[in-house]
Amino acid sequence: MPYVLQANRSVIEAPLASLAHHLEVGSTYEDFLAWVLALRDEVGIPHRLTEAISETVDVPAIARAAILDPSAATNPIQFKAMDYERVLRAAMSGVVDSAAI
């Protein structure tokens, strides 16, 4: 989730700052993201996707499939295949900032 948030940041930053305020976890996008990262740790979700899967991942194929997925239409930003690749590679490496579009 943090990687998708970062990729959509340009569109969702203000609403998530408001949500952070209502959740009483801060008042900025960064505060909300920090809360998500802490929650992820609390429930035991690995930081890197590669910690959760053992098989080789065909990143370009997954990115192409993501474009065709009906739920892609609900994303705040309409991603291209290269955007999905960036998000997936960020999730695999655990570097949230590298998901930025």
Question: Predicted segments — roles?
Answer:
Residues 2-101:
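Mobile late-domain/C-terminal helix-loop "cap" segments
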